Amino acid sequence: MPIMYNTGEWFKVRPDYYRKVELATPDWPLDLDLEYMWVEVAPYGGPLAVTRDPTKLVPVKGNARPMIRIFDTTGREMGHILWNHGKLIAMGWSDMEELICIQENATVFVYDMFGREKESYSIGDEASVTKIVEGKVFQSSAGTGVAVMTTSGRVFLKQNSSKTERKLPDIPNSSMNCSCWEIVTEGRNSYCLLGRDREVIKLFPGETVGTITANLFEKPHERIIKISVSYNHQHLALYTNTGLLWLGSVDMRQKYCEFDTGRKDMPLQMEWIMNSDNSEADAVVISYPSYLLIVNRNADRSDFPYDPVMFLVAEMDGVRIITQSSHEIIQRLPKCVENIFAVNSQEPASYLFEAQKKFEEKSYKSDEYLSMCREKIDLAVSECIEAASYEFCPETQKSLLRTAYFGKGFIRNHNPDEYMRIMRILRVLNTLRHERIAMPITFKQFSHLNTEVILSRLVFRKHYAIAIQVAKHLNLPESWILEHWAYHKVMNDPNDTEVARKITEKFKNPSVEGISFCNIASKAHQAGRDDLAIKLLELESRASLHVPLLLKMRKFDRAVGSATQSGDTELITQVLLEMKMHMMLSNLHMTIRDHPLALNIYKKIMRESNRAGLYGIYNTEDDQKAIAEYHFQNAIETEGLESNLSMIGNAYAQGRCTLEAELCADTSRLIKLQKTLSTKYNVSLNGLSIHETIQELLLIGELKEAERIRSEFKVPDRRFWWLRILTLSSQHKWEELEKLAKSKKSPIGYDPFVEVCLKQDNVMEARKYIPRCRDNRRVVWYMRANLFNEAIDSAFEQRDVHSLFELQKNQAIVNNGTLLSKVCDCIAMLEGK
């Protein structure tokens, strides 16, 4: 069944498939090296907080004061915090995308994503006196909380600034140091799990002392060094100093597996991969320097070489991986996606997908595939719609939705609501994932957050235009977005004039309904800014309130100004017609000269009603460019362009429009030349561009004439070579194409020669030019030409192991034992070296 290009990132951890999806390629600032940084990432595609890692030796550049920099997922800096407080112990993000920073003296500072401080509070006197050694920011049903461990080994929890801190029970034998700890949320309660030697200690609120669980591992080890709790707080992973991994339920009553990783080095992070289908966790991701290991509950594994430094971010349906050069997500493959794209899939959705492809190809096999899934076609359509929601690639989404659209035509009384809903959401998701917005969330995350939260996050990031479009697309009210923007301006911008100007520009669109300056003026008054409130009232742009009154008062200068600010062209036209009736033309011109939009509309009115009068305006203003355009339009309408080109060019020259004047001269020369050549060679060249003229001459074999035009009109060598190559290949003049390639060094390289040969299905000719292509392109061209033997040799000569691996996966090579053996031998030789 269908094998899509995106299956290349699938991998199996028996019995399930997982996939690694690239979300973006971050463009970090040149001075940011993540290897030396402490990074905290917000979930749901949120921002990153980055500061120097105090445990690493970092060359200090510039200001030596600690700084926390905040980036979005594309590497664009959103803000920064000059840390002028005490020692920073921990950082984390709240569910409201607030950065929470925990200081050594138990003070918590809260910042927004732009680095602006919002509030600060203390975790309590006892924690403040004894000092903090570690801290955690955790999520619960009650919101975001903070947990700290003091130098005395006590753990305190605080849900938010308004709640009282809670002290967890004492740690048994607290003189012994704990090596790791984590916070677990159970309903509305949160408790702590600590790893100490070979024990796990549970500190539950309300108890006097913690409870100890020991002997979880069967194999010998010295101590537990890492604890990881799944996103849903139902599963637990423990990692020992000897590389043993224990997976089980968070209450430690059920053990899934015990796995020996065989590694003695310290893991960087360990996170559970949540299942997007049923919110379960089936595997953990463990990161080491330059290495990533995935182990599931069945003790099966998969591993990848990776960047030396990486950061894992637990999500509700996967784990994001951020490195210096990549941003990816690892997910368990949704069952519906596997059903469609898995090799040899026998599922109805897979047959439907293939049927739709064959239907587009107009193949009779479409009906054969349809017959295989007709009994369960409703299930197939549902799976295609669901699979589209899980995909990140827009092309794959389109393919799946086309399949669903195709399939639902065979279902009587099919309800299209789900299809339309998913299509709308996917358009929103693709917009959010764009680098400009940088919110790479999944469909499941979008559904969990709900659209109101998404819109709020867009508004807070000041993506007001996108938020409005999303609201429109999802049939949600948009007025609150504009009101939020205006209120934000009123509260934060001290310049009354600037605020009034910005609000006017935003609200001048006549499509905006339900909002007036009166509402914003009222808020300005509530904020004690009466001057601004008056300005906002004066700037009301709706015709029923301001402009008609100004016209009645004959305040034409203010009327045209208000109408122009409103952006309503019909209103401006109404004002101009009134002015024309009651003012002398000279005064009217003087009034509207300071309002370019009104002036342009007035010219449009004159153009439609009095062209001669329009020419008089241009002469009065000595606007030579406009005069040239006036003559140009007249020439086109009267089909007298050739005879008027000289006059038009002179007008452009007087208006200092050098480029336009030169174009007129060139056009005149070209027209004359085309007439001569048309007569000489009995072909029609009239009305063609320079490019098309040269192409026609090449097609009839007049190379010298083409060379002459190229020289006279300064056609670049690259374009001319392209024209020759395309022309020769379209006429199958392969010997002349070869002569051209050998005549001198090609200014466009030799890739185009290969491309045109392959376009004409002439592999033998393409083979001649591939050796002359750049080294890094030869393997690609050999593969496109299905010259797999040469591709293998070329990749081996270039020591390109990556290309050899790609060749190894090629279906044609897999089916050819000789070629497959050759690829494997080459890989073995290169890796052996």
UniProtKB/Swiss-Prot annotation:
Which cellular component terms (GO) are annotated to the entry? autophagosome; CORVET complex; cytosol; endosome; HOPS complex; late endosome membrane; lysosomal membrane; lysosome
InterPro entries (UniProt xref): VPS16 (IPR016534), Vps16_C (IPR006925), Vps16_C_sf (IPR038132), Vps16_N (IPR006926)
User: What happens in the null mutant?
Assistant: Light orange eye color, probably due to impaired deposition of pigment granules. Impaired autophagosome clearance in fat body cells of starved 3rd instar (L3) larvae. Accumulation of Notch in photoreceptor cells and boss/bride of sevenless in R7 photoreceptor cells of developing larval ommatidia.
Position of the signal peptide? none
Write out the entry's keywords from A to Z. Autophagy, Cytoplasmic vesicle, Endosome, Lysosome, Membrane, Protein transport, Transport
Please give one Pfam family short name. Answer: Vps16_C
The membrane topology term of the UniProt record is: Peripheral membrane protein
Carries keyword Disulfide bond?
no
User: One GO molecular function term?
Assistant: actin binding
Biological process according to GO: autophagosome maturation; cellular response to starvation; crinophagy; endosomal transport; endosomal vesicle fusion; endosome to lysosome transport; eye pigment granule organization; intracellular protein transport
Q: Where in the cell is it found?
A: Late endosome membrane; Lysosome membrane; Cytoplasmic vesicle, Autophagosome
- Lineage, top-rank taxon, reads Eukaryota
Could you describe the subunit structure of this protein? Component of the homotypic fusion and vacuole protein sorting (HOPS) complex, composed of Vps16A, car/Vps33A, dor/Vps18, Vps39, Vps11 and lt/Vps41. Interacts with Syx17 (via SNARE domain); the interaction may involve multiple components of the HOPS complex and may promote assembly of the Syx17-Snap29-Vamp7 trans-SNARE complex. Component of the class C core vacuole/endosome tethering (CORVET) complex composed of at least Vps8, dor/Vps18, car/Vps33A and Vps16A; unlike in other species, Vps11 is not part of the Drosophila complex.
As for family, the record states: Belongs to the VPS16 family.
What role does this protein play? Core component of the class C core vacuole/endosome tethering (CORVET) and the homotypic fusion and vacuole protein sorting (HOPS) tethering complexes involved in endo-lysosomal vesicle trafficking and lysosome biogenesis. The CORVET complex facilitates docking and fusion of endosomal vesicles during endosome maturation, acts upstream of HOPS, but is not involved in autophagic flux. The CORVET complex may cooperate with the early endosomal tether Rbsn-5 to mediate endosomal fusion.
Protein's UniProt name: Vacuolar protein sorting-associated protein 16 homolog
Gene source species: Drosophila melanogaster
- Please state the gene responsible for encoding this protein: Vps16A
